[in-house]
Regions:
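Phosphate-rich cofactor/ligand-interacting catalytic cores and adjacent structured alpha/beta frameworks
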Residues: 1-65, 101-197
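Long, hydrophobic/aromatic-enriched structural stretches that serve as scaffold segments
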Residues: 57-105
Length: 197
């Protein structure tokens, strides 16, 4: 008997599923997974974030939120638990992929981000506890940096270009999501392709 053809779901659902799969994977040295928690952040905080982010993912897929708005709202919604930063980096990767309807579209979309997107990104950083280099002239925790973004008309993409030499997620934005593409290619090469899971 053949298996019925099943839709892989909306992009928002796929992003949510990716977040759930990532955190429940086994054997992630140094990271939270189903067998390892930190004192102040646990698996259930990550699971909560994946659920709480869904409306933002759906709004991005529908095109009703800008990148900056979606980043700020995703962080605000997922701060409803006490576990601190759970998915900031995942949001930076997934939101453009959802809005761009895949890697090719995301690669073009990120280049069109605005100064307002950059300001909202900095505000999102302020809502979480992401560790950053404090000696950086564009320190996300320094209120003067937001004014600099406005004064110098620095877009979100420019922020990522600036950060790319020392930040893997920023590098994904500026190199066409190369690691994301490689991981996707590996998954599609598995028996079953999109239905491998």
């Amino acid at each position: 008997m053949s298996r019925p053809t099943v839709s892989p779901g909306s992009l928002a659902e796929q992003a949510q599923f990716a977040m759930l799969l990532e955190v429940t994977a086994r054997g992630k040295p140094g990271n939270i997974d189903r067998c390892h928690d930190y004192e102040d952040t646990r698996l259930d905080h990550f699971l909560s974030s994946a659920v709480l982010a869904q409306p933002i993912f759906s709004a991005m897929e529908a095109g009703t939120l800008s990148f900056g708005d979606s980043m700020r709202e995703a962080v605000a919604r997922t701060n409803m638990h006490r576990g601190g930063n759970t998915h900031f980096g995942a949001f930076l990767l997934l939101l453009p992929l959802i809005a761009g309807k895949g890697i090719a579209g995301a690669t073009e979309l990120v280049k069109k981000t605005t100064v307002t997107d950059a300001v909202l990104f900095y505000e999102a950083f302020g809502l979480t506890q992401v560790r950053v280099r404090t000696e950086d002239p564009m320190d996300v925790n320094d209120p003067a940096s937001i004014q600099r973004l406005k004064d110098e008309q620095i877009t979100m993409y420019s922020v990522m270009e600036y950060s790319a030499p020392h930040d893997m997620v920023a590098r994904e934005w500026t190199n066409g999501f190369a690691l994301t593409r490689r991981a996707a290619d590996l998954l599609f090469a598995q028996k079953g392709g999109v239905h491998a899971i």
